[in-house]
Amino acid sequence: MTSRNYLLLTPGPLTTSRTVKEAMLFDSCTWDDDYNIGVVEQIRQQLTELATASEGYTSVLLQGSGSYAVEAVLGSALGPQDKVLIVSNGAYGARMVEMAGLMGIAHHAYDCGEVARPDVQAIDAILNADPTISHIAMVHSETTTGMLNPIDEVGALAHRYGKTYIVDAMSSFGGIPMDIAALHIDYLISSANKCIQGVPGFAFVIAREQKLAACKGHSRSLSLDLYAQWRCMEDNHGKWRFTSPTHTVLAFAQALKELAKEGGVAARHQRYQQNQRSLVAGMRALGFNTLLDDELHSPIITAFYSPEDPQYRFSEFYRRLKEQGFVIYPGKVSQSDCFRIGNIGEVYAADITALLTAIRTAMYWMK
């Protein structure tokens, strides 16, 4: 381990500001009102307001990574007679399918392939053919490839068919403008260490209160009981059922202040978009090709095909970039040899320019 700080070009954990890191230097008591009412309850309110101006929504914080919250929602929102249609076009949709299987939840997996956009007409046909489906679940920003999925169109279907709609917005909430009420989303799931630019330690769910209140007794897990966690926070002014990740929560509170200072989600989205466009243009100028067509890209992370040169090894490319202070992501696509570069977090235009210079220097197979 080195004391050097790298620029993380990843979809999270990501590079955070100095002030977000400094917020963790304070110790908090988990039952104290200054923490629970003064910090946790404020975060819950701010998250709900970021998600929608409509009434009837609430938020719940949950210890662990984003996947913990996804599993908590699936395990709590679906009753024993329910069935979920899971739209999958990457590792994170596939993970939801695996979770449902392990929990014994009835499900229909619509796998449209890793580089294909979900076919809304196909989803319509599935819903029309199977009236036992009660819920729809899908990923918004699928970081396996960098694809942005059509949550608006699927939300319209969910509304038309009267289905409960679950969206994994792990790598989009806080970085892409959305109104979850207008999108007909009943449960939105995200994490502290993504677009709001906090650090790892907890995830959160923003839910339609009426739906969440109906989850009592459904959970397949004690610690991942979303209803019980929500009731504890509601009844005890922000208190967590089990140990709260206090330092992570303080960092997140600071990150929310910095999001507002930047100009809110719209301004952050604009920065992320510009980062991603500059990255793609620069990489193409260096001879790299993107896995996806431009119209499918999210402004979060981009997958690039690996060079075909026999000398190329990702591990060596990665090492040379890391020596220059940049950390990128390996590929996660099963059928294509690629790597990924994220552009969220404390990453600005000058950082993308510096990264592209470093990549040119690291292209040892061209020398």
UniProtKB/Swiss-Prot annotation:
Source domain of life: Bacteria
Any one Gene Ontology molecular-function term assigned to this protein's record: 2-aminoethylphosphonate-pyruvate transaminase activity
EC primary class: transferase
Record keywords, A-Z: Aminotransferase, Pyridoxal phosphate, Pyruvate, Transferase
Enzymatic reactions: (2-aminoethyl)phosphonate + pyruvate = phosphonoacetaldehyde + L-alanine
Enzyme Commission code(s) on record: 2.6.1.37
Keyword Transferase: yes
Listed InterPro entries: Aminotrans_V_dom, NH2EtPonate_pyrv_transaminase, PyrdxlP-dep_Trfase, PyrdxlP-dep_Trfase_major, PyrdxlP-dep_Trfase_small, SP_NH2Trfase/AEP_transaminase
Swiss-Prot/TrEMBL cofactor(s): pyridoxal 5'-phosphate
GO biological process assignments: organic phosphonate catabolic process
Coiled coil spans: none
Sequence positions bearing N6-(pyridoxal phosphate)lysine: K194
Function of the molecule: Involved in phosphonate degradation.
Assembly behavior: Homodimer.
NCBIfam families per UniProt: PhnW-AepZ (TIGR03301), PRK13479.1 (NF010006), transamin_PhnW (TIGR02326)
Name listed for the protein in its UniProt record: 2-aminoethylphosphonate--pyruvate transaminase
Annotated source species: Salmonella newport (strain SL254)
Lineage: Bacteria, Pseudomonadati, Pseudomonadota, Gammaproteobacteria, Enterobacterales
